[in-house]
Regions:
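Acidic/His metal-coordination segments adjacent to aromatic residues that form catalytic metal sites
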Residues: 83-90
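Preference for long, well-ordered alpha-helical segments
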Residues: 127-160
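Mobile cap/lid helix-loop segments that border enzyme active or cofactor-binding sites
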Residues: 1-45, 65-69
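Alpha-helical scaffolds flanking conserved acidic
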Residues: 40-46, 77, 95, 129-132
Length: 160
């Protein structure tokens, strides 16, 4: 049951109307992350799911991208997210994105200070891609936590 308003368990967007200015800004940020960033789809999805697992957000965990199949993303890709360090179906670039996202969500100050990680990260990603990854993780972490804390849309399954 939603902690704000009286929205059904599968309504993931109605609550934004309570705060139209901020809700509209969040909508624009969401659109930018999903439609204008430069992350390869598999990189975006592994990072998104690593944050979703950390947030325990049912909406995020149940969301899929309709163009995923064309990018080689199937349910096995999603089933092994918690095994990002070892599952052979992920590339080194995808593992690095998953590590970034996981640590962004669970231990951000240690991530900041880990020079070995940053050296590995820069082997795979340009500053532009890293910026897109960081901003995307910020959206997923913040929005996922809001949805979870306010118990909004937790039975909703989305296709992007």
């Amino acid at each position: 049951m939603s902690r704000v308003g009286s929205y059904s368990d599968d309504d993931v967007a109605g609550w934004l109307s309570i705060s139209p200015e901020l809700g509209g800004a969040l909508g624009a940020f969401t659109d930018a992350v999903y439609n204008r960033n430069r992350l390869p789809l598999r990189v975006r999805e592994i990072a998104r799911m690593a944050v979703a697992e950390a947030n325990e957000c049912a909406v995020c965990l149940g969301t899929r991208d309709r163009s995923g199949t064309d990018a080689g993303i199937d349910e096995h890709f999603y089933d092994h997210v918690l095994e990002w360090e070892s599952w052979p179906g992920y590339s080194a670039e995808e593992r690095t994105a998953a590590e970034f996202a996981h640590r962004f969500a669970t231990d951000h100050t240690a991530l900041r200070d880990d020079e070995d990680f940053w050296a590995r990260c820069h082997e795979h990603f340009s500053d532009e891609i890293l910026t897109d990854l960081a901003l995307s993780c910020a959206l997923w972490l913040g929005t996922g936590r809001v949805l979870r804390v306010l118990d909004i849309g937790q039975t909703c399954k989305l296709t992007l």
